[in-house]
Amino acid sequence: MRRGLRLLQHRRPVSPEKNSTRRSRPANHLLSSLSASDFDLLAGKLEQIRLPRRAMLEDKAKDIKWVYFLDSGVASVVARVDKGREIEVGLVGREGMTGTVVVMGNHRSTNTTYIQVDGSGSRIAADDLRDALRGSISLQMYFLHFVQAFMIQVTNTALANGKAKIEERLARWLLMVHDRTEGNELGLTHEFIATMLGVRRAGVTTALQHLASQSH
């Protein structure tokens, strides 16, 4: 578990910031592992992008215009429940992509996705990705394998939310974020973590203290 969570103030949603068209191989694991022929189908359409904290990547029930491939940072996939509350159902980092519903042939997001740890990456217009998928069976299968892996993550998150103690859920969440970030600090508030786990802030504070005591 990481020590010394750095506290930051809550921010309102912002927009990703475009840099330039990307042509070299990115750090994103999905893109960097593509065959040369499949990568060429995407390369000319990829745009480098800065992803500041709270940047909105997908909004529930709205058409997906862009699919994002993170090189750094972490995105939260959240479900909105009663009275505007949110609970995290999945994480995406440099291992993956957003827009899984696009890969499966749909147009609208089923959840909301935004950046929780700022970073950078690349994006492609959803229509351009659809064109590339139609042009390559191997590309379709490759991205569908990620969709399956992401669905397993979502299933395990649901199981943890329903059965695990808060300390276990928090430890799991911290490790998942750890796998997708660099350094020894997370610029996240206890309140934000509580929102992601769907628990009270006081519960997160107590659980963090318990985990810290176990690490000595």
Whereabouts are the PLM-identified features?
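Short amphipathic alpha-helical elements of helix-turn-helix/winged-helix folds
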Residues: 169, 173-177
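Cyclic-nucleotide recognition modules
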Residues: 90-148, 152, 156
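Hydrophobic (often cysteine-bearing) scaffold residues that line and stabilize catalytic clefts
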Residues: 66, 143, 166
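Short, Lys/Arg-enriched, Trp-marked, Pro/Gly-tolerant hinge/linker segments that flank
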Residues: 154-166
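A residue-level structural signature of the nucleotidyltransferase/glycosyltransferase Rossmann-like core
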Residues: 31, 67, 89, 121-122, ...
